[in-house]
């Protein structure tokens, strides 16, 4: 038996496609939504001005209840003040509520899309690699996706950026995760065969601005790399073919040199169309 667990606060643009890419390969899907961000603030110092922090443009609860009617899908509210071990906590919640436990659990984000049959391949790979507790995938990060385009764009592969994480429950005494679904021991075991699409740079412009402002606030709280405040205006909203240095971190913009043309393979396109 396999479960999938999602967490979502914003970004409903691609969650239907994401769920459709895995629903035939899992027994249950738990979608946990939060109405509050990890870090709450009423105002934010942004571009040398103090502004009101915007309201989440997505009514996530309403969207989920309207679009997901399958008996496989369970929708729950969950609020927290840190993403640290969030997936581990979410698994504990559903495991305590269900008598029958799965052999595998998949931790997913709402902007991640598997290719057709790719989750089955990932499951087989983890099964055969008996020494691993979990396995993750690298990501093809699509830049400003447009369904009408034959050619879309992507950024170069970021080799240490983990995608969805599949855990083998019988090999794990307790699931402890970092901010993502990867193990808190920081070791990432990447699949040799499977990559997924990440659509996180392709949300609508209102959601992208909200995501950007959350990153500005959250980076200050956790002491992460300072966010380039002009990224949204100059790099994303105002992007064209000549735009370079796309990383959001101030001082590290060159880590993503530029976006380049990319024809999305059919195994992913079956869910995007």
For each feature predicted by the language model, list its residue ranges.
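Active-site-proximal specificity loops/subdomain of glycosyltransferases
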Residues: 2, 34-104
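Short hydrophobic beta-strand elements that form part
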Residues: 3-6, 31
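Short beta->alpha connector loops
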Residues: 8-14, 172-173
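Short, well-formed alpha-helical segments that are part of the catalytic scaffolds
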Residues: 11-44
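Short amphipathic alpha-helical segments and helix-helix/interface helices
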Residues: 16-20, 61-65, 95, 122-127
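Catalytic-site signature of metal-activated, phosphate-bearing donor transferases
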Residues: 83-95, 103, 111-273
């Amino acid at each position: 038996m396999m479960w999938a667990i999602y967490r979502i606060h914003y970004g409903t643009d691609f969650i239907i496609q994401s769920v459709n890419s895995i629903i035939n390969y899992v027994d249950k899907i738990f979608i946990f939504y939060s109405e509050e961000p990890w870090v709450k603030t009423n105002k934010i110092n942004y571009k040398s001005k103090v502004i009101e922090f915007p309201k989440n443009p997505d009514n996530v609860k309403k969207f989920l209840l309207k679009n997901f009617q399958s008996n496989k899908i369970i929708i729950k509210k969950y609020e927290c003040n840190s993403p640290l071990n969030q997936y581990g906590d979410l698994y504990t919640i559903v495991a305590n509520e269900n008598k029958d436990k799965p052999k595998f659990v998949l931790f997913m984000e709402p902007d991640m899309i598997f290719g057709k049959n790719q989750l089955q391949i990932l499951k087989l790979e983890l099964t055969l690699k008996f020494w691993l507790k979990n396995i993750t995938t690298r990501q093809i990060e699509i830049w400003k996706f447009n369904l009408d385009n034959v050619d879309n764009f992507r950024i170069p592969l970021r080799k240490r950026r983990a995608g969805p994480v599949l855990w083998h429950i019988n090999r794990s005494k307790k699931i402890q995760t970092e901010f993502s679904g990867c193990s808190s021991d920081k070791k990432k075991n990447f699949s040799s065969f499977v990559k997924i699409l990440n659509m996180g740079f392709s949300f609508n412009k209102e959601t992208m601005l909200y995501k950007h402002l959350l990153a500005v606030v959250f980076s200050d709280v956790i002491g992460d790399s300072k966010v380039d405040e002009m990224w949204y205006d100059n790099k994303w909203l105002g992007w064209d073919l000549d735009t370079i240095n796309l990383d959001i971190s101030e001082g590290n913009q060159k880590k993503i040199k530029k976006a380049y043309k990319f024809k999305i393979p059919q195994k992913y396109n079956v869910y995007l169309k």
